[in-house]
Amino acid sequence: MSEHCVIFITAGSKEEADKISRGLVESKLAFCVSTLPKVHSTYYWEDKIHVDKEFLLIVKTRQDQYEALETWVKNNHSYEVPEIIALPIEQGLPAYLNGIDDWVAKN
C-alpha cells in the first residue's frame, strides 16, 4: 500500500474552504491543500438532484492519517455528510513525498 494519498473534500464557501485548509495544515494532518474555486457539482441528495458551485480541496497527506483527518473534517465541516474521498499516490517526486513525511505526523 502507498504511504501517501490525495484526498478530495468539497466546501460550500471560500471561508469554509480556507478554514478547512488552514486547520488541516496547522494540525499536521496535511502537508498541502490546494483549493479549486467554483467547481460545478451535480449530485443526488435527499431524493432530488442538486447543482451547486463548490470549492474543491485537494489534500496531500499520509495514508496513516486518513482516519484522524476524516474525523477532523466531520467535526469542522458544515455539511451533514461531507465529500471525503482518498486516492493513493502511487508515484511522486521523492523530495515532495519527503516533504509530506517531514510535516505530517506519523502513526
Regions found by a protein language model. Give the residues of each.
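Positively charged, small/polar-rich N-terminal and surface patches that mediate targeting and assembly
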Residues: 1-107
